[in-house]
Amino acid sequence: MNEQVRSILAQETTKTSKIRQLFLLGVPRAEIARMVTNGNYGFVVNALRRMREREGGLNIHPATAALDYTFNRKFGIEIEAYNCSRERLARELREAGIEVTVESYNHTTRPHWKLVTDSSINGNDTFELVSPILVGEAGLRELEKVCWVLDLCEVKVNESCGLHVHIDAAGFSMETWRNLALSYKHLEPVIDRFMPASRRDNYYCRGLGHVSDGMIRSARTVDELKGRIGDRYHKVNLEAYSRHKTVEFRQHSG
């Protein structure tokens, strides 16, 4: 199989053709992404979906066919930055087709993007850009467009800026919640190593090391687990579930 893979990768053909051949050979999607698209997993998923639609389904192993890797979960994002007035950024976003309003600080979920103030951010022309509820790959494409506008406006980040991601958790079982807390707690030292120092022991994104495994495993409700972890200023924020039915990951830097 290794020889077949090398032969496919050496072909002077399109990425899509290589993806198709490797997939039919049984190579996992993540590995295909690593070999063909420099890790762009979404490109691989989209290419395979287009092929299924065009060819009426690929001739693949039944066990593989039963798996659906389409990203369709709801999510939201909060981007903290500075060096661009909220008014100018709003104009640029609207010109790019992004609906956005300029507001004072609030926790209300809007059907559009909002630019709000945040007293925790240092710098000139600080802002927090908060998304509406985004869904799946269409949401990722909209987020990508927003990031292009941020680059255009030359926004900056510093150690006071964070990037917060909300993931829809409405369907989580209690087992999923416990596994999530345990996994993050045990992987926290690894995650810390690729985060800047300002995001490792930050008041606004504290760790889970103070909660014992036993305390996590014995929690019977989300509220009970939330009470054992603490307030919303933790790397994994369970308080978001009460307000938005999401789990919030707060550790990443701006």
Q: In which residue ranges do the predicted regions lie?
A:
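Short acidic, low-complexity intrinsically disordered linear motifs used
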Residues: 14, 51-52
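Short, basic interhelical loop/turn and adjoining N-cap
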Residues: 30, 34-49
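Short, charged amphipathic recognition helices of the HTH superfamily
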Residues: 25-35, 162-164
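Short, amphipathic alpha-helical "recognition" segments used to contact nucleic acids or chromatin
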Residues: 11-27
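C-terminal accessory/tail domains of diverse enzymes
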Residues: 31, 42, 53-156, 170-254
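Basic, amphipathic alpha-helix used for nucleic-acid engagement in HTH/winged-helix/SANT-Myb modules
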Residues: 1-15
